[in-house]
């Protein structure tokens, strides 16, 4: 049995940190219905859809993201009015929190909450924790959406140096439609 003990000093301890940087392309073929089997799970409540990398009934399927749409009062949409308002309010409570008066804040275009353009209609994409782990690296997010003959690319340009910290859930970057990230031009 050992009877000799060594005291560890502060210089005897080494701390290392490894950042995992991986690009995860989610191609349009997964969400467009290109494959014969369904990768998109539609729920009876019609509040959101879940997207998988393989047919969702397969044991190999991994959940990639959920997508939903929500709006606040004053929006023109009528289909499932209460459900869509509940989605907006739920996401706003979690992501932007409450005003000092106790009201749910609206999503803000530039993230400042003190004036500016408020988003009344929002599309929410909730990525699986399996994919994003602890965070998406700031300045690396790009989303390209095709609709018919038009295409739009959204990215968090400059977010590694210009991000917001006023969310109850942590840090976030503003999405822009061009590489010129000028104040007040964010899309969400």
Which ranges hold each PLM region?
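Long, position-biased, composition-driven segments near the start of the mature protein
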Residues: 1-188
């Amino acid at each position: 049995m050992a009877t000799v003990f060594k005291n560890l000093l502060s210089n005897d301890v080494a701390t290392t940190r490894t950042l995992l940087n991986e690009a995860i392309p989610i191609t349009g073929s997964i969400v467009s219905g290109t494959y014969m089997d369904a990768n998109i799970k539609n729920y009876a409540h019609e509040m959101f859809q879940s997207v998988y990398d393989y047919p969702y009934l397969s044991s190999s399927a991994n959940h990639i993201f959920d997508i939903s749409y929500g709006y606040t009062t004053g929006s023109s949409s009528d289909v499932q009015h209460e459900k869509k308002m509940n989605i907006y309010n739920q996401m706003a409570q979690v992501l932007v929190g409450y005003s000092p008066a106790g009201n749910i804040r609206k999503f803000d275009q530039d993230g400042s909450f003190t004036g500016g353009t408020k988003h009344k209609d929002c599309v929410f994409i909730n990525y699986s924790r399996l994919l994003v782990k602890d965070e998406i690296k700031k300045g690396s997010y790009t989303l390209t959406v095709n609709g018919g003959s038009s295409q739009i690319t959204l990215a968090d340009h400059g977010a590694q140096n210009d991000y917001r910290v006023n969310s109850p859930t942590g840090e976030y970057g503003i999405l822009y439609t061009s590489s010129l990230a000028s104040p007040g031009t964010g899309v969400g």
